[in-house]
Every structure is written in C-alpha cells, then in structure tokens.
Amino acid sequence: GPMEVLTVGVVGTFAVGFLLERLVRFRSEHPRIELRLLTHNNKVDLSAESLDYAIQFGDGAWRSVQADHIMVAPLSPLCAPSLLEQLQHPDDLRTQRLLRSYRGQDWQAWLRAAGAKGVTPRGPLFDASAIMVQAAMFGEGVALAPPCMFARELQQGRLAQPFDLAVDVGGYWLTRLMSKEPTPAMLAFRTWLLAVV
C-alpha cells in the first residue's frame, strides 16, 4: 500500500535528548510510515501546524487535548565543569548568570526547594532549552534543565550537575487534538513511544 504520512511536532530538548537516537528502531518496525518531524523550540501549536501529535513539556492539563504521559523530567542546574568548584552550595548561584527559558517560574521553584538565599535569576532568556544548555556548556552561565535529557553530555564530562536536587515542575507528554481521529500510523507511533520509555 501507499506510505502513510505521520507529522509529529516535538520540543527540541526531547528530540535531541531522547527521540532521535530511537527513531531508527521505529522506522525499521514501521517501514510504511513516513515520519515528518517538526522540532519546536518550547511551545507547540497543535492546530496551527496541523500536527498529528505534539510532544511537549508541561503538566498535561491542556484544553481540548488528549495527553499521554511519556515521562517525568525534573529540573536541576546544569553548568560547564569549570564552574563546579564555585558551586558548593545553592547560595553560590548568587554570583552566577542564571540562564532562563520562557518558563519563568522554574528557577524560583528550584531555588525555593533548595532553600537558597538571596539568589535572583538574572541572565539571558532562551526560547529553546537545548540551546540554553549548549550555552551553559560554553560557560555562559547555569541552566535549569532536565538532566535525564542531557545524560550523554554529562557522561562525556562536557556538562556538570553541581547539585543533586531536582524539582518536578512537569514532564513530557504525547498530545493530540481531541477533535482529531487517530489514524493507524498515529496509533502505531503512540504504542511504540509509550513502550520505549
């Protein structure tokens, strides 16, 4: 039969940190599905892009959207290994540039949980977490991001996690508009994705 096209929007961090290295397996298991991947910075608009699915980060409470929980992804500060010595205690973040994403409250949530005193998140704003973490690797500042999505960089010693504390502000979800009837290709992708996590 003809190829079935499947269009999936995915936030960049999840694409790079999890999905891309596993897509080979999906393609070999489903050779008749042509997967179109649209990477989005942090926000995915299901209706505007006529996406079949969107993989996004949040609490899962989106209106008129069917959301399947993929995984939790707690956030923790990440920085260049060269900054580790300067970061013995959460209060030490006072002297650092704190790189921020469009999710403005995330740093406050972590700093509160860490009991950090007198630390104000001041630093450049990024619209893509993956780019923000890249900037942190170059020593631009400290990023707040899910370590589980940057396991490779942490293992290779290109990135460091100065504190064990991670704060849970959301996770990754597979979402579709409730008004959209799932196609066989969509169901195949959903079954595959929820099984590999």
Predicted segments, located by residue:
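Central regulatory/effector-binding core of bacterial HTH transcription factors
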Residues: 2-62
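Short, well-ordered beta-strand segments
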Residues: 7-9, 54, 99, 143, ...
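Residue-level recognition of the GNAT/N-acetyltransferase active site
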Residues: 11, 80, 177
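Short, surface-exposed acidic/glycine-rich loop or hinge patches that mediate macromolecular interfaces
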Residues: 13, 101, 179-180
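C-terminal regulatory
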Residues: 44, 48, 60-169, 196-197
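A late-sequence structural motif
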Residues: 165-197
